[in-house]
């Protein structure tokens, strides 16, 4: 009992507030052992002060809380699922393996059943049944999340959208696409490009991630600077609520002010309030001309000045302004054998333009490049207009995450800060950690003020971890930043929410959860902190 | 009792669902007469079938419901307010007049007190007191709404944001503005233009409307096509909840995925869930070049083809594509003495470009104009690049609403439809009404699929109204449109919500209202329908 001094669960009696029930879940867990929850990432348990701010396990706020008293899946349940989804109720442990572990292989669940419905009605029947039986459910898209949000923590039933991959409609006048939640982002991109449109979002995981998962996690990615967030581009959603009711908000209108915009509740709530089954989204025209420039800067200050100059001179054709530091480049060369196309620099920039007139775009880009080269803001650079070369330059930015996985163990932080502060955190962290870390690297979306801070060590190192956290969160909070800019909170970051949100806001989130999912069956242990007071 | 056969109110006992309490409120109302509610717009009461779909008063779903049993303002209450807001507690009936009636002079309340706090703390103390005393409150910004959402229906206390007009901060690197809710949109525009930025929204009412009201109503306006909706550009809000608690979500980050995005609840909920006291908003750079073209088309089909061509050729510099029909032009000439700058046509288009390179923009615009003139899509046109001429061309679109007010009585509809359908509704309505209406005119935002359908008669005409409604809503619903694209529902449209939203969605809205404002004191009788089942 020493380890988890407090735990919280959704109260069944109150629909308004989560209530903290000390010891109750622990007692249940103890009775129902063995629980097979295993957080590979976190295993050290130290005796430190119980901090209310950091939730159930103050020594290790990312660790899984005790299993909540959900029912266990019985043979009778399996019979129900098999009758409902013949051939699509998976219980073979080998087939379940990849769905029980996240992409980073840091969170390991132990679910015994994976359901693969094809229709909204199927999802509805599953949730109605699970809600009645008090069975917990983990909705899963492409399972590419980085915060342990898309895998079970214990034995939650995995509800996969992988067979829900139909495009319902595309209107080539308005550019509005309507499709099922399980469509893979890259497949949608190909579908649209054939029709002279593009998706308003793009990210490294596009080959696997599902649009439903993108919406559930409010994915940002590489095009946010230009096309804005999913909160603006998603026009409609169909969602199945915890009790199986289908909420049809699948509008295909650019403007609709009839009542509260319910779909916003489900964007970014990581499957904890409902399961998204279909999406309608506003897609931009495919640009007639795309150019990518890869530039080098000798300081972050020069990089920022280049960004300012770029926004002024490229204006409406600027579609991405990304950066990586020299340490990232070293890892790309070392592990992925990618070649640095320019001379070595402390900082590299990827600039993309997308416009409707190739001549105009090239002229703007060349004027900009001339300006930043003659003023010595940029020390070297290369430009690509041809698709293969564009892809090669982009891969230098997109494959940093992959390169890092070869380094041993990676501690990942996804931070929003005022743009002029983003690299200060990397430099300060290097000073702070001294020789403890193998690498402290920074890359990300300058245009959005979004830093991906990654710290590597040969293997898991809890002394290193203790030096990073909560230091990184305190640093972020001090500058009124966000401790999760685009990755979400999932399992790993849930208890750090108070560094970015006041307690009144978190309490209200708990009320919303309790209203929509009173039994708490949807993606438990995710997003919201263990203790909401 | 015949008139209002059912009425609903927020249940005090349940936080989960609105409950329908037949007759209860009626009884209270009868005891507490005189109630001075007067809906100027609607006075006819006919004996028709009670339609559940259309709420409390099926003959006249826009009419005010009976007064709910809120407390009446006492001398003791006034003493409290005067101590809290010395000199800013207005009870002089002459001074209250303009705050009791909407801009269109169609909804008339009878509030006896107008409060003008300067700070969030002031708003908090007012709401805490009103919630405890069960006093209803009508939040009011610039009072420019068109659906009766910003004026009291009975004796609700008017809580004005007019003295909350401070700019807190502007970051000229990120373009993020943070200000109080009562800042007038045009003042913010001037403030930003001096700093080489612009507001991401612009609308005809800019000289009076408040940014807090814009956000509360999710105002669309003229720049939505380019800069997207407030759901994407508003980065943070500070909101005072019904019980006086301050919810600080005033982030200034472009990306933040830490938990549910609570601010979205308050965008577009018309002050029924909380009072917005401060806003942070992402502002675009001021474009270096602006051009406006005013064109004529001989059919709506040609107008649509011009739109398609325009999107392709102007691409990223297109910032507005608006239209008005010949009837609108006649009214502009007749009542406002504006001059049509081109030859007479059935349809007129206002196209605005905004870009970073004047030469490129002019070249794109000229190429586009050459294309649409030589292909005869457009019959005549004029272009302005100079500010005064740009303003003059824009006024032809912006002042249509004003011209209509001179026509006698106007029935206003703000409809979203698939863009190729928007003028069909105008033509069909003309056929349907025959000689009953004086004018049936259409104008609006083609780029957003948003039609402003306006029907005039010399004076209020209930036979005409009965011919328009619910016909117009049924027509819209048949094409899966929105019965309120950007104006909101307010008092006038609240009971028509079911034409655009399924009952499950409306019930969930009721649950959210009950959770955040269990006594229902915030802007009662607005947004949600009288009967939620």
From Swiss-Prot, chains A, B:
Q: Which cofactor does it need?
A: FAD
What are the binding positions for (R)-malate in this chain? 397, 401, 412, 487
Q: Where does Zn(2+) bind?
A: 445, 452, 486
Matching InterPro entries: FAD-bd_oxidored_4_C, FAD-bd_PCMH, FAD-bd_PCMH-like_sf, FAD-bd_PCMH_sub1, FAD-bd_PCMH_sub2, FAD-linked_Oxase-like_C, FAD-oxidored/transferase_4, Oxid_FAD_bind_N
Report the subcellular localization: Mitochondrion
Record-annotated FAD-binding PCMH-type domain positions: 107-286
Q: Which family does it belong to?
A: Belongs to the FAD-binding oxidoreductase/transferase type 4 family.
Q: PANTHER family per the record? A: D-2-HYDROXYGLUTARATE DEHYDROGENASE, MITOCHONDRIAL
> Per its record, how is this protein called by name?
D-2-hydroxyglutarate dehydrogenase, mitochondrial
Starting at the broadest rank, the lineage of the source organism is:
Eukaryota, Metazoa, Chordata, Craniata, Vertebrata
The UniProt gene name for this protein comes to d2hgdh
